[in-house]
Amino acid sequence: MSNRARAVCVPALLSLGACAVMEPPPLPESDVPQRFIGPVFDEADVWPNTDWWNNFNDEELSAFIEEVKANNFDLAINRRNLASAQLTLREAGLARWPTPELTIGDATSYSRTSLDGATVSRGNENDATQLAATFTYSGILTKPAIYARDLTDYDSELAQSADVAMNTLATATSTFFQLLLIRDRIVAARQNLENAEVIGRIAQARVNAGVSVPIDALQQQIQIEQQRTALQSLIQSDLSARASLAVLVGRHVQGFDIAGQTLQNVEVPRVQPGLPSELLTRRPDLYQAETSLRGAAINVSVVRRTLFPQIKLTASASSSSFELANVLASPAQTTARISASVVQLLLDNGQRRRNIEQAKLFLESSLATYRRTVLTAFNDVEVTLSNIQLLEEQAEVAASSLMAAEEAFRIAEVRYAEGVADFETVLLAQNTLFSTRNAFLDNKLQRLNAILTFYQALGGGWAPGDIPEYWGVTAGGT
C-alpha cells in the first residue's frame, strides 16, 4: 500500500471506531400500560421515599434499620462488590487509551578490528545509558464499543447492589414485624389458656355435681393442654425471630432484644404508583434487565467490528549516551519512530459470521427476558394494589368478628355455668374465639407486609445512578 493510500485509509478506519454502537430494540407499546387499574388512595404520596421504613412511624424500627445499614454482613459484601465493579470500570476506562512503556537501562559495547588474523585496532569497553518510551494503541475499532459494554456492566452491577440493599432492608423490616406479631399472639395465647382453664373448672364442677359426664371435663383438659403447647411454641418462635434479627445486625442473640411488644401501634402507611412507564427506571431489577439488553445490543456491535481490519499504532522514542545527564538534557539526540499496521483476516471458515448470528440470538433472548421482567413487574403492582384493598376490607371484618366472638364466648360461658347451654356449645364458642383472635392479629401483619411488598414493587424510592451514603462508596467509576 502506498503512503498516500495509507494516509487516506487509516484516518477513515479510525473514524469507524467512533461510530455509535447498536441501540437495543424498544419494548412493544402493548407491554407498557397507560395507567394502573388497581385501587389507589388519592391522598397518598406518589412513589415511595428512599427512607420508606420511617413511614411506619415506629421509632424503634427506624433505629433498627439504621443499625442494619451499618452492620449487616450482606450489605457489607454488597458495598465491596460495588467498589470492585468501580475498579473494574476504571481499568476498562484506562484500556481505551494507548499503552505507555518507559524503560531505562545500561548497554556495554566493545570493538575490535582484525585483518588476516592480526589485530589492527582494539577499542575500549563503552557503557551507555539508554532511555526509551513506547506508546502502543491496538484494537482501535473495537475499544469504544467494548467500553460502552463495560459501562452497561457497571450499571447492571449498581442496579443489582440496589436490589440487594432493598431486599435486605425489607427482610429486616418484615422480620421486625413478625417478632411483634409473635408477641401479640403470646398475649392472645395466654388469654386463650385462661379462658380454657375457666371452662375447665366449670366443667369439672359440673362433673363433680353429677350434672355432666366426665368426658366433658376430659375434652376441656385436652383443650387446656393444647393451649399450653401453643404458648410454649410461640415463646420458642420469639427466640427464633430475635435470633434472625440479631444476625441482620451482626450480633449474637444472647443479650439482643427489642423493646416493642405489640404490632398494633405500628401504622399502616399509604402510597400510590405513578405512571407505569416511570416504573421502568425505578425498580432495580427492571433497570438491570434493561442494562442486560443494552449490553447484548452493544455486544452485537463488538462482534461485528471483528469484520473490520485490526489497526495498531506504535510510537517510540529512544535516546542513549554515556552519561545519564546527557540522555535527559539532549533531546536532539533522540531517535523517534511512528508505525501503523492494518491487518485484515480473510479466511476464518465463517467463524466471525457465526459469532454475529449468536450475538443476535442472544440479543433476542435478552429482549424476551426484559419483556417478561417488565410484565411481571406491572402485574406485581396490580396484584399488590388489589391485595392492599382486600386486606383493608378484611381488617374491618376481623375487628367486628373478634368483638362478636368475645361476646358469644362470654354468653356461652355464663349459660354453661348456669346449666342452660351444653358443653358442645361452649366448646364451639371457645374455638371460634381462639381462631378469630389469631385472624385479627394476622390481618395486621398481612397489611403491613402488603405495604412492604408494594414498596419493593415500586422500587423502594431508587433511581438509576443512586448510591446511598451508607454504602460508603463514592459515585463514579471512570
Residue ranges of each PLM-predicted region?
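A short glycine-centered flexible hinge/capping loop motif at secondary-structure junctions
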Residues: 207-211, 416-420, 457-461
